[in-house]
Amino acid sequence: MTHQTHPESPLSRSPSPGRSPGDDPRWTLGDRFMMRVAGLPLESLHALRCPETGGWADRVLRAEARLRSRGAELSDRLHPLVKGAGDEHARRRLLRLRRELFNGKPPTAPEAAVALVAATDPATAGAVGDWVRDRQALEALLAEGAPLLAAETARGRAGLRRLLGEDRLRLGLLLASPTLEGRLDAYIRTDPDRRPDKRLRKVERSALAYLYRTARKTSPFSTFTAVALGRFAETGHTSSGDGEQTVRLPEVWSGHPRLNVVVLARLTELILGDPARRAGLPVVLASGWEHDDDRIRYVRRSLTAGDDGAAVTFDAADDRLFFLRRSGTLERLLTLFAHRPEPRYGELARLLGEEGGADPEECERYLTALLELGLVQIPCLRTDVHAADPLRAFRDSLEAVGRPWARRLAEDLAWPIACVDRYPAAGAGLRRELLAELRRALSGIQRDLGAPEPALPRTLLYEDVRAGTGDAAAGTAVTCDPRAWAGDGDGPFTSLRSLERVLPAFDLTLPQRITFKGFFRARYGRGGRCEDLLKLVHDFHEDFYDQYLTFAARREPFDEDGRYVPEPNWLGLPQITAVDAAREEWTARMRRLWDTARGAEEIRVPAGTVDAVAGKLAGVAPDFAPQSHFLQLVRRDGDPMAVLNQSYGGFAFPFSRFTHCYDGEEDGGTLSDRVRHAAAAAQPEGAVFAEITGGFVTSNLNLHGRLTDYEIVCPGETSSVPVEHRIHLDDLYVEDDTAADRLVLRSRRLGREVVPLYLGYLVPLALPEIPRTLLLLSPTSMAPLDVWGGVPEGASGNGVTSRPRVRYGGLVLSRRSWTAPASALPGRPAGSGPEADAAWFLAWRRWAAEHRLPRRVFATVTPAGKSGGAARTKPQYVDLDSWLSLSALDGLLKDPGDRVVLREALPDEDGLRAVSDRGTHVVELAVETLRNDRKGTGAPK
């Protein structure tokens, strides 16, 4: 098919950089990307370094190396003198001298030792004397370290105090760690020349972690990291393939805060818990309910509250097929709803009592039970997934209720709304006041609603920050010339196109999608059709999937002997066997590559490896694969390179979370509209994209603009899209397209295939049962690239094992790394003071030289006795030129058995080309690609 493009579309397609359009028309690179920009320039971190102490340490190491070499030589020259010694006493003295020289230690009595050697070998005695003098010079050199480090540490602490006043750090801390932010001023006022006490050292380490995060990491959060909408375009002054283009960053940043939607959920709980207020709210029956013989069938949706004390929290949503026995009272209720689809709760209770002659309290209890069971719902106060401003939308919903208490509550929300509105333009001091006022106002509202103690999440606001605008005509959009990264046939984008062929082998969800297809065929036969999608989902979970997930979660990919453990394949599906074969092929080839490259800093995956693994996936890999890749471009003379950090399958992932930042008039049209136009252009022929919202909005990570024309409305859900664009679950059926070897979701009303898309930022496993199952029919994927899985580590050197950098063409698939227990790292010497600090800094310098570490790394610590991602700390930046940075790392280590993984900071300072007036910034590009190998129209047979 020929894709249409929209001129302002984030997914407008351009030919793959570095190749002509005719090479592979099935694969395209989106011409728009989202750039993530670290808040502080790297140059700001230089103030924390100890360059003079580093130079001193390097001189010490060079002197030690020279003495070690000469000492070994002299030890050999002393060997015949030991054997020829005239008496036992002289022999023992010479033997001791020989050991001292070999070990680089100063002789016990240097003058006597030189005289002893001179008696039989004057030339060697002269060399020993020179060695002793140089060894004494080393002692003098070692003594220089303590005052140097003390002075530079004081300067570093003074620099740290200055940096702690940076707005982009402080504004982010107000939301990320308000407690720490509140302690920084006290730390700043202390004397940098004085060694901080235990309490202030803890503040210092935490402050350093956030400072390094603001300058070195690219995970968007408030002013720590901004996003900038960009596009690939030829700039007219870039040489092809040299990787030397400088990317100019926007100078103006703007904040876009939103209230944590958990706050609205807590207010709704209080309103619904009050019978008087509940009586005035409109109620509906759960959408999608049906008669099922003598029962009512519907989907029961429930929420489990998250931990309000956590920095990031959300309520867990769940849905289950549920049945209620039909009764006279229930039938009367259904009849009432048939005549009045949306009565108010109190009115419904009254009518139900009048119809059945029941006591009002009894009717109230009955409706309350149905409300808890989810058959009766009050949806008017729910947060809509497409709400750009959830707090205002909640206020508007209250006003629409039309009751005095609701109007008063809506008026009470005016002040919280004003606090949020004033927040973006405020400085740190005013923001601090606004957050405190917001908490007071919301706590007061909760008390007015009857809460004995307010229950508010720790984080009240989440803020996304935009760098520049999204309008290229305004001159503040980011532009990157793809020719600069084309390379000589194997640049990053060309390599990415090839690598995508093997990503299904790493996809965590592919075995689940294959299993679902196998279950369907076992239940409905090849070429079968299921008209009752809700029953299919229920049966799949009840009869198979829940047990399958439990079993799969316990699976370790490799056993204790390093052998691959196949995926659970209870249905004996050959496609799962093919996935296993592809993974084993990758592991076997990486083992062979590793065997030939021990000690190398970098190894390259041959094209034949990718071809072989891709060959195992023939007939298994999806034929329609929109992908999002997170890349960091690296400046290398004549060798353009990019680090591939993450890959996800799906549509619009780089943009969806940030649409509210780009939906203003100054942005040349809303980003949501542009993405939606792109979606329409990218749809497979005969198919439509339809969003799965995931039901209740329990997290700000689920909020985004409307990005598809259609939306799948699951039972129990409500939708804000136009009625004609809603696709209810009972309009859908599943059919086995044997020619294409895939399950196809179709709409009876539209007469077209429906491709489900999830556009939020929650992992699929966090979604309720129905949307999670529908995603097994979508192009959603998660493919963490574990290139070293099943490959044995090399022999350790003093407890340290290392891995080289892994490249495929112009892509870095894995950074260089070093793994060790905390006990193998340089330990703090006994005592405290400048001498101990200098000795420890020197020990780190010596350790880094021994294991060939670069100057800058990221450290990930897993506590002793624990494993898995939940136990690991987030990677912490470590600058080996900074004693303060090393001290912050030391604070993370609690046990000698803690496992520490150090990974090179790539790109490092010399590999960055993104600049602002402030300096050079770490950036990450989130790009989109689309591979479409689909044959046929997707239209119903």
Task: Give residue ranges: language-model regions.
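Hydrophobic residues embedded in beta-strands of well-ordered beta-sheets
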Residues: I296-R297, T383, D741-L743
